[in-house]
Amino acid sequence: MKIKIYTDGACSGNPGKGGWAAVILDNNTNQSDVFGSEKNTTNNRMELMAPIMALKKIKSSSEITIYTDSMYVKNGITEWIKKWKLNNWKSSNKKPVKNKDLWVKLDNSCKKHKVNWKWVKAHSGNKFNNLVDQLAVSQTK
């Protein structure tokens, strides 16, 4: 099955109350929205939670395209994570990788699927990016 997922995270204050959201589209026909919040968090943690929680909803191995407006998430999962693992979860400045717990969860969540990551410009008129932005922001209230 081919699935598209749009994700976003938001934070009121950084750190502060955060929200995440994802829209899951299977074969462009069925849409399901997932979203949630955390009390004391950061925008980057919320950006990571959105794809983690969306991937949890997909039970069978699938071909998935995940759209995010976060270069942090896209670059982290497609490029940086390989080096982090080789360097015992240390960043290029030899410090522990921030949000390692969520990077590990996201990496593990991707393993049972064929996942393609795409960056989408925020607030650029994309219907589903706008929707996940609104849902994520609503969770920060």
State what each model feature region is.
Residues 10-17, 53-131, 135, 140:
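RNase H catalytic domain
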Residues 1-45, 53-58, 133-134, 138-141:
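RNase H-like nuclease fold core
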